[in-house]
């Protein structure tokens, strides 16, 4: 996966720089979301892997599947990816583009996992505290995992804050083994 991300990075950067210069970050993000979803479809993967189709034919089919959701510049981007045999990288390109967009807009998605459903006011307080700590606008998504026993686990990017009872018990067990 790291290799695919490395291959996707220059394409994501080029798309981001173009979208930023054209003041179309959201439009490009939405187009990449659609394109990545199309590229992830099993039938599309098989069609892209078929050697019987030329790069131009693959791009044409791909653009047709996306329909009117891509403007001319975005279609050209798809054609460039097809000519370089990189259409399969679209999910990685979308992810890298999303990170660059979030960095530019100073936003971050935070996943909060708790043993039980958290009250809305607690989620709002948590969002405010994280926003102040991270100096970003925070978008909180919550989920439930009963195996945590209590507390919360917060995921943001590559950072994990484990405030769960299960995590504390694991640390205690590790300390007792030492």
Swiss-Prot record:
Keywords: ATP synthesis, Cell inner membrane, Cell membrane, CF(1), Hydrogen ion transport, Ion transport, Membrane, Transport. GO terms for molecular function: proton-transporting ATP synthase activity, rotational mechanism. It is a peripheral membrane protein. It is found in: Cell inner membrane. PROSITE patterns: ATPASE_DELTA. It comes from the Bacteria. GO terms for cellular component: plasma membrane; proton-transporting ATP synthase complex. Its main location: membrane. The keyword Transmembrane helix does not apply. PANTHER family: ATP SYNTHASE DELTA CHAIN. F(1)F(0) ATP synthase produces ATP from ADP in the presence of a proton or sodium gradient. F-type ATPases consist of two structural domains, F(1) containing the extramembraneous catalytic core and F(0) containing the membrane proton channel, linked together by a central stalk and a peripheral stalk. During catalysis, ATP synthesis in the catalytic domain of F(1) is coupled via a rotary mechanism of the central stalk subunits to proton translocation. Belongs to the ATPase delta chain family. NCBIfam families: ATP_synt_delta (TIGR01145), PRK05758.2-2 (NF004402). F-type ATPases have 2 components, F(1) - the catalytic core - and F(0) - the membrane proton channel. F(1) has five subunits: alpha(3), beta(3), gamma(1), delta(1), epsilon(1). F(0) has three main subunits: a(1), b(2) and c(10-14). The alpha and beta chains form an alternating ring which encloses part of the gamma chain. F(1) is attached to F(0) by a central stalk formed by the gamma and epsilon chains, while a peripheral stalk is formed by the delta and b chains. This is ATP synthase subunit delta. The gene is atpH.
């Amino acid at each position: 996966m790291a290799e695919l991300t490395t291959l996707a990075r220059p394409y994501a950067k080029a798309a981001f720089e173009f979208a930023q210069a054209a003041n179309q970050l959201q439009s490009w993000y939405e187009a990449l979301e659609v394109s990545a979803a199309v590229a992830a479809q099993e039938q599309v993967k098989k069609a892209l892997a078929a050697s019987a189709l030329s790069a131009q034919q693959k791009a044409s089919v791909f653009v047709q599947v996306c329909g009117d959701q891509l403007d001319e510049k975005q279609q050209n981007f798809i054609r460039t990816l097809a000519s370089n045999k990189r259409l399969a990288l679209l999910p990685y390109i979308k992810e890298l583009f999303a990170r660059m967009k979030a960095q530019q807009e100073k936003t971050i998605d935070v996943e909060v996992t708790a043993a039980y459903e958290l009250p809305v006011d607690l989620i709002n307080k948590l969002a405010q505290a994280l926003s102040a700590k991270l100096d970003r606008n925070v978008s909180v998504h919550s989920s439930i995992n009963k195996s945590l026993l209590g507390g919360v686990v917060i995921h943001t990017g590559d950072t994990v804050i484990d405030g769960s009872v299960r995590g504390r018990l694991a640390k205690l067990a590790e300390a007792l083994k030492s």
